[in-house]
Amino acid sequence: MDISTKFDGLVLENPLMPAAGPVVGDAEKMLWLEQVAGCGAIVAKTVSTKDAHIPHPCIYGDRDYIMNCELWTEYPKEKWINEFFPYFKKHSVGKPLIVSVGYTKEDMEVLIPALDKFADAFEVSTHYVGNDLNALGETVATIRKLTKKPFFMKISAHMPDPEGFAHTIKVNGANGVVAVNSLGPSMKIDIASREIIYGNTKGFAWTSGPYIKNIALATVYTIKKAEPSLTVIGVGGIASASDVIEFLLAGASGVQMLSAAMLRGKELYAKIIADLPATLEKYGFKSVEEVINTNLKHETVFGMAEPPSVDANKCSKCGTCARICPYFAIEMDGVPKFNSEKCFRCGLCVSKCPVKALTYHKADK
């Protein structure tokens, strides 16, 4: 099974990369992700012209999300230039290194020339710059003048105009988009202490992890549809091999993961890579490239002929469908019984059935 992927001159033996963050916060961590976890490429923690002043604690983990106020690297750029990147390049097995930098045009004028010799490509965070597309365009044009390396602009989940973002970076010379950065601002309150327990000086943090996967998928799809020539790297919510495939189907050429590994263990990188061949085979794919080249189907249906049908052999009689039905249309009589007049054909019960015993009935065309 061929799980390799190629884009913008980069060749990855598998499509999974770490996202910029604490797990790639120095050379030893990056080498672990490359050689132990087996990632297809390495993305370094974001470097800026100033080292970040980070509050503590700065990371909060819940079941399906991470909240962080960690900002970018806590180390000065000189430590990356003189120590981390040289050490990584010396001991690397040669997988692509994507150097993450942020944030403004003025930052780029300092960082790109200083880091160009280490980078196989750049990822550029716009997280704290705002939504000004004119300023974005100027930043992209500046980067293009400063390097011949491919570079990808990272879009935040709260960007109101992803199509405009994509068009702006394309016409100014970027190779692609990394979609998406964390979502926010967000907040965590401890009721017992009447306290905001994580956050910056305003009490705010940023949310990532499986919780934001559907937002990330929609952004990847939107950008690839709007600007097909741009490379898209998907990030936000990946936690399994099937998640990887979903992002590739949505339009990504590669993917990044961070939060799920922080919630479930760093061994998750190797597990996803190991699981990918069998998961591809399960869904009838022969390679990652085939997934990327698959046209995603979509059909909007207005109305369904009948309520969902029940497979009595699968039904566990758990009653979940009846308890959650917002239209009070299901009663349990051993198996679910639908009131056709009350049933709105909304689909909630089908999506929530734990044993997949319910099936839609689409209206005749």
Please tell me what each predicted stretch does:
Residues T320-K337, L348-D364:
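Iron-sulfur cluster-binding cysteine motifs and their immediate structural context
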Residues A44-K50, E123-V129, G176-S186, G237-I238, ...:
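Glycine-rich phosphate-binding active-site loops on the catalytic face of alpha/beta enzymes
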Residues M67-V93, L136-I155, G199-V232, I272-F285:
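Alpha-helix-loop-beta-strand connector modules within alpha/beta enzyme cores
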Residues R63-L133:
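Active-site beta->alpha loop and helix N-cap motifs at the rims of alpha/beta catalytic domains
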Residues E28-W32, M108-D116, M159-N172, I223-E227, ...:
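Catalytic cores of alpha/beta
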Residues D2-K6, A27-H91, L136:
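Glycine-rich, positively charged N-terminal anion/phosphate-binding segment
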Residues H53-M67, M187-F204, L248-L249, A260-F285:
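C-terminal helical cap(s) of enzyme catalytic domains, especially alpha/beta-barrels
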Residues I66-N68, V124-A135, F165-L230, R264:
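Glycine/Thr-rich beta-alpha phosphate-binding loop at enzyme active sites
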